[in-house]
Amino acid sequence: MRFFYYLVFIVAGSVFVGCHPSANSRGEVTGVRQRAFRATVPYGMVYIPGGSFLMGPVDQDITFAQVEDNKQVTIAPFFMDETELSNSKYHQFVNWVRDSIAITKYLNDPKYYVHPKGAAAPKNGKKYIDWAFVAKNPPWVNKKGATNNTNKLQSMFYQGDDRVFDRDEIDVRLLKYKYDEMSLRDASDYQGDLTKKRSDFIRHDTVSVYPDTLVWLHNFTYAANEPMTHGYFSHPSYQNYPVVGVTWRQAKAFTIWRTRFYEHYRQSRHLPSDREQYDLPTEAQFEYAARGGRIGANYPWGGPYIKNAKGCLLANFKPGRGNYSDDGATYTVAVRSYFPNDYGLYNMAGNVAEWTASAYDAAASSFVNDLAPTFNYNAKASDPEIMKRKVVRGGSWKDVGWFLQNSSRTYEYQDTAKAYIGFRCVTAFEGRDIRDKH
């Protein structure tokens, strides 16, 4: 009987070993076979091939700052939004935050949550919103026969003396997005320190997501911009115009949400993650993409002039003293206006200036690396104001032509919003070239 059990053990062990993925490797290291991968371009983005370029000014330094040096640098391939982020897309973020808060803090209705069972049930006890159900049954719309949510959601509207004409308007101060982010740079600074835990490098932040619509007034004193304050973010005529009035922290929060939004979709379809996280472009990525592969070009369209042969202005900016409209618009224009550059990117110069991921230092070019250069600093609320400066690129509808140059750089503080600053996202390409077969 003992021999029988021993024989069964050997047979079972043989079956176990025979089923191992390396059973046919004949003792050689053959690697772990993974699924075939074919890179796809994310929706609304274009592929920017990697390459080397001379970063910095190609024209005279009219500011006489004498701190802008040229530097030959190399950029890895990446994907970039072909346009500035529109009001419509940012509205999707705001609405997601609004609905999340309504469901989790005010309704507490089980039908808005998924109810997985068995192994699929979350082990941390957290509840997850069933967004497919929410899309068909919005908490703000009372369909025939549906439970009336008006009373439960009343606290999300302005109350008492804050109401105007007794209208139900969302109190936008409640719309805050809370997120966690692993800081790889912080972790790398403590390399080999065994006293640190992973949680020491996870940063937590809570950001108000609604744009500051009053920027149209406090950015331009003694100007009648009330119509832009009332309608720019809310009126459907502006849905395809670039979002403005967002701080750097709000733009960063959007990139985190966009990453999570895509990952949750993949998880809901039981698909593996196939994309790097979204982020703001570094200033080197922005300049490289703006040049469109052209060498020594002043502007994204390649030529040294801001007008074409017919005398038409090639971007939305301020062409003369007190003159904002000769380019075809008084304020901003739709995100697909004017011709794209050779990479297919719209408005890399003009329309709205854009936040980058890079912190600002006047002499950054003298100390950043020549491979994927950037200067990053995660400023805290307690840090001096000078540490909260972020690089702004591209020039805007209210700027003169010099700011439209590919190499022109300026800055704003990360917690300030402007009527002329927006943003677009990037995500890294994993591999050497999109044409490679994996």
Model-derived features with residue positions:
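Functional-site microenvironments in short loops/helix caps that host divalent-cation chemistry
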Residues: H20-R26, Y47-I48, L54, D59, ...
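Bacterial Sec-dependent N-terminal signal peptides
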Residues: M1-V29, A289
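Non-catalytic, alpha-helical, charged scaffold/linker segments
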Residues: K105-K197
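Post-signal peptide N-terminal segment of mature Sec-exported envelope proteins
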Residues: R26-L54
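N-terminal post-signal-peptidase region of extra-cytosolic proteins
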Residues: F64-Q66, T74-A76
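Short proline/glycine-enriched turn/loop segments at secondary-structure junctions
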Residues: A379-D383, T410-A417
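Short capping motifs at secondary-structure boundaries
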Residues: F78, L85, V94-I103, T255-S268
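Short, structured beta-strand segments at or near domain termini in extracellular proteins/domains
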Residues: A419-R435
